Each structure stands twice: as structure tokens, then as C-alpha cells.
């Protein structure tokens, strides 16, 4: 943070640098790509290939399945989904992101390349499809070694985060065992 002046996802306008990795690679003849979540200041024009995904789906939805996935994640599974997700393993973000990256890499036969693969998961909406949903039983997970009582020791940032969690997961304490199992799945 002291070098770039950026400490969070929310203060990208404050970024400070003379040259970045993508720029150096492009100057040296590399083809560049981003597949997945853009946790940077980069824009589509900065790279040769761009396929961005957010927490609620692909940013540019092209297929009916991508549109349905985004609808489900945005409207039904906003914070978490406590049942097996209707999104198939083939349509889950990590699978799509990896497949798109591999397809792009295949086209780079004669080119040096850099591909940034970044998954939105594990992150809310916490949803997972079969067979992963059933892999970890909530009642067999280790007991948590922390609770909301520890927030008093953690400071303001953690209290704000807890408020955000409560807003997206109104029954968080009750649902936490299933959410943890989904996260691991």
C-alpha cells in the first residue's frame, strides 16, 4: 500500500505508479489477457483479451445460460443459497473462466503471453452445485473458534464488515454452518 497508495478495492483512483507489469509485458511483445474478476484498475482496452466476471455473473452475457446464471445469482442467491445450486458445474464461474483462458492460450502458439486468471469465488453469493454441495456436511465441520463477541477486540473495520454481512445474510448465525460447507465445496 505504501508504494501504490491503494489499500482497498474502493480507492483505485488514488493509485500511483510509473509502469505496471502488464505494460512491461506488452512492451516486450507479450499478448495479455484477463479472465475472471478484475481486482485491479485495468480496463478492457489495456489487454488483448478480456472476459470479466463479477460476483453475480459474466459482465457481458452472451448466452442464455450466462443470462440465467446472472438472474439466479442476482435475484435469488444474492447473499447465499442454502440448497444445491441449479447452476451446473459447467456453468459455474471457475469452470467458465478456466475454459475461456485455456481457449485463449491455445491461440497463442507463436506468442509469449501473460494471462491473469482471477476467480470471484469463494465469495458471496455462497452457492454450490452438486456434487460439491454434498461433499461437506455442515454438522461435521470443526467448531468455529470465534464469534461476534470478538468484534469488540477487532476494531471498526471488522464491525463495518459484520454489518455488511448481516445485510446480505440476515440469518447469518443460523445459516453459518451451511455457508461454511458451501464455501469449502
List each language-model region with its residue ranges.
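Active-site-proximal cap/lid insertion segments
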Residues: 59-96, 104-185
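Catalytic-site neighborhoods of secreted/periplasmic enzymes
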Residues: 1-90, 97
Amino acid at each position: 500500500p505504501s508504494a501504490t497508495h491503494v489499500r482497498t478495492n474502493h480507492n483505485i483512483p488514488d493509485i500511483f505508479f510509473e509502469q505496471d507489469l502488464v505494460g512491461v509485458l506488452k512492451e516486450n511483445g507479450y499478448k495479455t489477457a484477463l479472465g475472471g474478476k478484475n481486482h485491479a484498475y485495468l480496463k478492457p482496452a489495456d489487454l488483448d483479451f478480456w472476459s470479466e466476471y463479477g460476483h453475480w455473473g459474466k459482465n457481458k452475457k452472451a448466452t442464455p445460460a450466462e443470462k440465467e446464471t446472472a438472474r439466479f445469482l442476482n435475484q435469488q442467491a444474492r447473499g447465499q443459497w442454502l440448497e444445491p445450486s441449479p447452476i451446473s458445474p459447467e456453468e459455474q464461474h471457475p469452470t467458465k473462466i478456466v475454459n475461456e483462458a485455456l481457449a485463449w492460450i491455445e491461440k497463442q502458439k507463436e506468442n509469449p503471453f501473460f494471462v491473469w486468471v482471477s476467480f470471484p469465488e469463494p465469495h458471496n453469493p455462497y452457492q454450490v452445485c452438486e456434487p460439491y454441495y454434498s461433499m461437506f456436511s455442515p454438522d461435521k465441520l470443526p467448531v468455529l473458534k470465534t464469534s461476534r463477541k470478538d468484534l469488540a477486540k477487532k476494531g471498526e473495520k471488522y464491525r463495518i464488515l459484520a454489518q455488511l454481512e448481516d445485510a446480505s445474510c440476515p440469518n447469518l448465525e443460523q445459516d453459518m454452518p451451511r455457508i461454511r460447507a458451501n464455501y469449502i465445496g
